[in-house]
Amino acid sequence: VTDENCAKTVTIIGAGIGGLYLIAELGVAGFKLRLHDIDDSKLSEIRGRGGVDVEGEKGGFAPVERATTDLEPATDGADVIIVVTGGNAQAVVARSLAPLLRDGQVILLIQGNTGGSLIVRRALDDAGCRAEVDIAEMDNYPYSCWRLSPTRIRPIVRKRWLQIATFPGNRIGEVFPRLSPLFPEAVAAPNCLYTGFTNANAMLHVANCVANAGRIESGDSYKFYAEGVTPGVARLYEAINAERVAVAAALGASVPTLADWFERVYGVRGATLVETCQRLTYNSDGPYQETGTPKSLDHKFITEDVPTGLIPMSALGAATRVGTPAIDALIEIVRSMTGNDFAAEGRTLGRLGLSGIDGLEIRHVVEEGLT
């Protein structure tokens, strides 16, 4: 690590597969890493090994200098704190971080889902955080890999295109140079509407689960993308995708269609979305080879992607008077199927700090910050 502007010491919060992705890439690259999780069983073998073994052409050993359930030693002196916990836990993590943060630190959400940076900013403020910290978010996980054991992974593919945004957007010029050496494929986005509306998980996961609910609940272990995305499911993808792009455009954000996103990120574009999903599964380097089928509808593909993805997209559509009938239908069907009212607990305009304002004012908030 030679760039004087970039982060040197990085704390990763969340020791799931997303956290291991980051340890593998950043540790081999020479960044000083700390790892935190509330579950010590996820940390003990990494702590005993002193890091993670990474297979492959650019593999090696990724050392972790601290692996702890205690946030204070995990974050003390860190330049960047990367939160890889899933969208539903981001506010909880922010409240725990609030008294420990120091001026100049950057919190990076991987991923921000839709509105993550706003949620974290409000949580820090509500918890009385006085430190001057920056908040950034990425639109997706940067890598795909196989976990061979608790301390050994094999990378599959690096995403070719990622976006990083800050909240407020006017901080990107200061923050991006510190983060770009960690993620060379990333580009700076003008604000968090760009990253939030490039939330592919919300597009891909919920519709597939709803359309294949019978298979999921009967225990059919189908290939989630190659077999789950039929022509009808692909048309549903297209419908919710068109609404996502339209709401983003009404807020001044230009975001890629689903087909364009697949091509930018993975270099794959089939004649149809069905073909694209099959190639992403069956190609030798296909990132979806190991995508598991949910065992029930009580799965993060629903419990995370509805409240932190579809709910805020629908709410922002209402604020800009852009209809989202397909997204709204999915939300209602999920409520009926699961009995969970995700609209009541999700990222509403009120929770985002955007209630009572129109699209132009929302654009001002994401550029300049909450007042």
Regions found by a protein language model. Give the residues of each.
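NAD(P)+-binding Rossmann beta1-loop-alpha1 motif at the extreme N-terminus of oxidoreductases
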Residues: 2-56
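Rossmann-like NAD(P)(H) cofactor-binding subdomain of soluble oxidoreductases
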Residues: 87-151
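Conserved hydrophobic residues forming the short capping helix/wall of the S-adenosyl-L-methionine
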Residues: 50, 124-125, 248, 317
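Nucleotide donor/acceptor-binding cores
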Residues: 7-9, 105, 133, 160
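Internal alpha-helical scaffold of NAD(P)-dependent oxidoreductase catalytic cores
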Residues: 149, 153-223, 227-262
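Rossmann-like NAD(P)-binding element
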Residues: 59-100, 105-108
